[in-house]
Structures are given as C-alpha cells and as structure tokens.
C-alpha cells in the first residue's frame, strides 16, 4: 500500500520578537498575567515586507532543501492559512511562483488553527489516490494583521510564522511500523462558529475585520474535542498513548496542552512545547513545533508522532505519523 512519508521539513519566523513586557505600554497587562494564563513569553510579529506568502515561501524552500529535492519535483503546493495575501488568487499560487514551480497545481485550505492538520490529511488523500507523488504542505499565518490591539484577551495570544513539510509517496506494508501517515481524523461543528471568528469579510462588511474570541468557551470545549478525535485515531490503528514517542499539539495555550496530555496519559517529557516562544501561530503552529523538535534532535526517524489541533468553526483533528 502507498504511505505518505515526511521527506523534509522547514520553518520561517519574522525578525521582530515581541515580548510580554512590550505590551505593558499598549494595554493593561503584565508578563506575569500572560504567562500564568497562557504560558506565552514572546512571539514573532511580521514587519514591513513580511507576509504570509514570503514566510510560507521561506519555510517551503527550507523543507525542499531538507528533503534533498528541487522545487520542480513538487506536484502539489497546499497552503493552510486564514490570513492570505489577497482574497484571490490563492496564496499557494503566489508561493508556487516564488519557488519557480510551473507544473502541478496549488491551492489554499482554510480551517484556521486546524489548517495544517486538515492540509496533511488532504495531501495524504491526493498521494494515496495517485494524483500527486510529492506534496508541499505549508502552514503560514500573519495573525498580527487581524488582531485588535486594544483587546488584551486576544492580542497577547498570537504570533506570526510558517512551517512546511514535503510528503512523498512510498511503498508500505499496511503495518503500524510503516513510516508515514498511519491515521488521520477530522471533525467540525458549525454550531460553535461565533465562539472564535473574524468580524469581517468581503461578502458581509467588505473589510478584513478583527479576531474575536470567547476564550472560556473555547477552553471548555477544547480538551474534550481534542482527546476524542485522538482516541479515534488510536482505535483505527490499534495503537495507544503508551506507543507515542512525541506529542506535538497545536500551540494555543499551555493549560490546554497540559490538560490534553494529562487526559490522554501522555508523559510531560513527551510533549513538544513552543507556545512560550511562538505564541499561537494558528495553522503554522504544529509545523513550527515539529520543525523545532526535529532540529534539536528530539524527533528521529522511526518515532511515532501524534499531531492535533483545534480551531475556529469549530474545526479539529488529529494525525498519527511514523517519522
């Protein structure tokens, strides 16, 4: 059977780092207040000339180089983002141009913070269906451009950045010891869409709008939804939490991460945490955390890695991948 194997990985972050203390002159808050409630200490903020496309292209180049490939080897460019450069065309097409790719196809996918999980799952289907051999999966965001910088409950949470992987078709044996994606489960429930949203859009207000969130409601639902979809992935493969080498969750809030790991009985030392230095980078969150753990030598070939995310909609999902 065909498996979608991770061939390469890369990341990119804006130059500017904004620490919690930098907010003290803008809004009523403190480093202690932010760290205690979120675990975030700093985040990267896009500056002039830094966009979703430029960050996504930089992460993509790094992933392609890490894979030992050329841009011309890519069949599909799939970008997960909620902050595209333009309403249309897709920012994936712009990244395709930046990379000099003139073959295959490219499109954007929007599932907010779950975007990278949705994109990996979509890429896996294209690969196993024979429509693409190599897929460049990117999560890139510039959420700083849609924040209300007077709202202390949201503006301190988010950062900008991008991460990317190259998925490649490989022959597997149908075993959980195979390298590649072993299981993926996605969910959504539009009944919760008013709990996390942007209050604008071309078809309604003809503006971009700002991010709005009912933080307590999101927190209340997050742990249960995340663990349920992870359990579905375990059930599909016969694997358990004890088999996991590394848990790479969406980096939204350390309290949500800790509660999810505890409910799943995953040891703290197996959890990859980057929320302290990146903040919540939405669709870029999971690939940035992955890239960090690969770069520092934690995630190695053959490791079983659990990915998960939850975002506006609500959308949520989980992926089990053998590195």
Curated annotation (Swiss-Prot):
EC numbers, comma separated: 2.3.1.180
The keyword Transferase appears for this protein: yes
Pathway: Lipid metabolism; fatty acid biosynthesis
SUPFAM superfamilies according to UniProt: Thiolase-like
One Gene Ontology cellular component annotation held by this UniProt entry: cytoplasm
ACP-binding, as annotated region: 251-255
Disulfide bonds: none
Domain notes: The last Arg residue of the ACP-binding site is essential for the weak association between ACP/AcpP and FabH.
Function, in words: Catalyzes the condensation reaction of fatty acid synthesis by the addition to an acyl acceptor of two carbons from malonyl-ACP. Catalyzes the first condensation reaction which initiates fatty acid synthesis and may therefore play a role in governing the total rate of fatty acid production. Possesses both acetoacetyl-ACP synthase and acetyl transacylase activities. Its substrate specificity determines the biosynthesis of branched-chain and/or straight-chain of fatty acids.
Name of the protein in its database record: Beta-ketoacyl-[acyl-carrier-protein] synthase III
Protein's gene: fabH
